[in-house]
Every structure is written in structure tokens, then in C-alpha cells.
Amino acid sequence: MASIHRPKRGSLAFSPRKRAKSHIPRFRAWPEATGEPKLQSFAGYKVGMTHVIMVDDIKNSLTQGMEISVPVTVIETPAIRVAAVRAYTEDSTGEKAIAEAWAADLDSELKRRIPIPAAGNQAEGLENIGKLIEEGRVSDIRAVTYTLPKSLTGVPKKVPDIMESGISAKDLGAKFEYAKSILGNLVNVTDVFKNGTVVDTAAITIGKGTQGPVKRWGIQLQKGKHSRQGSLRQIGTLGSFNPSRVSWRVPQMGQMGYHQRTEFNKRILKIGSDGEEVTPEGGFINYGLVRGDYVLIKGSVPGPSKRLIRLRDPIRAKKADLGEPNILYISRESKQG
């Protein structure tokens, strides 16, 4: 039976629906650190979508062992550079950064994003963090990284995108030693993820500007004579007479899109270094050619082409590890119709 009461289809969980503060998505939590020391996140730029033919390796699936077509998102992932090591302390109000150590040699393009600290900060900063760890004042060690979009032909910008990444290690000492070893160096996507692993993706969605309540909230069109009185695509009422104010729950027009969205447990089907393996004839629409390292993610990822996409170790990991997928074919047919 159809639902009689249906004021809107949109979820109030995402309110307020306003523009994201930055095009760089944020991860506010990190999974528990296990295994060998490594970064817990990476970043790339969305290229577009295609499809692959692979063997279905999902247990108890109706098509298990059969060849299936799977849509995939292509993300170009050039190496990122570790700019700084950051130490956190925790008190009753939460975590706070108490010390940083910046690398001595950084790319000149980083000046376009932030003021670069003095070159002599590295040794002094690392020594300071080491003392804080010995005193027991440090709760976590993280790395500040930035991308190098100047190496991409499909992304028309030179300014790096700077972000923070957690470090996976068994204790603070191991985290600090690993952070010191990669400070100022390049990190490749193969140093963080491998084929078949599951990741969380975060991105800023496609911005659609100001939209009406029908498109923004999925309300019904007005019926009968109401639709002929100039209010076809409007809500029937702003609410009750009392209380004498408009509730934030009322579906109204406003900003749609350009919101941060995080999707959990997206499987990496392939990590490659030769972009020609996935570039279709004529290149990807609104992007062009993939020339370097890339990642194939099963399914869709938020955001338009050229948008920054962040990948993180899964915070709600599935128990079963499916292993490396068996990909038989990657479609390189033209996407231009």
C-alpha cells in the first residue's frame, strides 16, 4: 500500500544543505592501526567512468564464477609528498596539535597554498616531537601531505591540495619512526593500497546551485486546481500557525550539491601505472588522457571529473577479504557517443 503521508523524500540527516567550506574533503576519524607502518589515506583526481569484464568472486552470488560487467571509476593518482609530521595531545576537550616538523625541501608550488616554514625547522621539530613522546604527552602522530597536480595533463592547475593523513602502526614509536622516514619524500599509491582492498572514498559532490523544493527534496507536484494557480512546483504550506515560525524541517528551495559525501567500503579493482590501459579512444570527456598511475574503483564516486578524491583505509571494514580480482577486459571504447 502506498504511503499516505509523504511530506518529502530527502533526508534531514544532511542538513544544513549548504556549500562545503573547501573542495578538499576531510576525514574526521581514522581506523585502528594494525600491520606494517603506512599512511592510512591517499588522494587522486577523478577522471571518469568505464566498465570492466571480470570474474564474479563474491561468495554465494548468483553469478559466482561467471563473467560479469562491472562499472568502474577511474582516479588518477600521482605520487604525493609528505610535508610535515604533526603530533597531537588529548585532553578533556579533545585532540589538539602541539608540535610540527616540516620538511626542509618542499615544492615551490606549495607557496601558492600556504606560507612555507623556515628550512631549519625539520631537525628541531623532530627533536621536539621525540621529547614530547618520551614525556608521554603525545596521543597520536599524523602526516601532512600534499598532491602534485602539475604532473597531470587533465587537471589544469599547479596549486597543491594539502591534507592530513593518519599513520597505521602498532604504537607511537613505530608511527614516529615511519613518519621520519617518509618526511619530505614521495609516496606512491602502491605504498598505501593494493589490488582488491576495500577503501572509503570522500569527495565534494557536483554543485547544482539554487534549486527548487521538487528537485532538492523530492516533494510531489501540486494537484488539481492548486497546480493551475501559479504554484505547481511549490510546497502546500510553510507549517502551522503556531508556533509562529518556520521550521527547518520544511522542504524549501536552496543550495543543492557541492556537499561533502563519504562512501564506505568501495573495492579497488586495479592499481596501474600505464594510463593507456584505461584511456578510451579520444580521451575521457572533460578530462583527456590518463598518463600516469591510476586506480579503478568499483562503482561510482561523488564529484565531477577533475575533482579531488580522497581514499582511506575502511573504518567499517568488511570481515571477508575477497583478494585480488580477476579482470578480463577493460573497456576503452570512446565515451563521446
From Swiss-Prot:
GO biological process, one term: translation
UniProt entry tagged with the keyword RNA-binding: yes
InterPro entries in the cross-refs: L3_arc_euk, Ribosomal_L3_dom_3_arc_sf, Ribosomal_uL3, Ribosomal_uL3_arc, Ribosomal_uL3_CS, Transl_B-barrel_sf
Coiled-coil ranges per UniProt: none
Residue ranges, annotated region (Disordered): 1-20
Highest taxon of the lineage: Archaea
Keywords: Ribonucleoprotein, Ribosomal protein, RNA-binding, rRNA-binding
Gene Ontology CC entries for this record: cytosolic large ribosomal subunit
Record-level Gene Ontology MF annotations: rRNA binding; structural constituent of ribosome
Alphabetical list of NCBIfam families matching this protein: L3_arch, PRK04231.1
The family this protein is said to belong to: Belongs to the universal ribosomal protein uL3 family.
Function: One of the primary rRNA binding proteins, it binds directly near the 3'-end of the 23S rRNA, where it nucleates assembly of the 50S subunit.
Assembly: Part of the 50S ribosomal subunit. Forms a cluster with proteins L14 and L24e.
Record protein name field: Large ribosomal subunit protein uL3
Organism: Methanosarcina mazei (strain ATCC BAA-159 / DSM 3647 / Goe1 / Go1 / JCM 11833 / OCM 88)
Lineage: Archaea, Methanobacteriati, Methanobacteriota, Stenosarchaea group, Methanomicrobia
Name of the encoding gene: rpl3
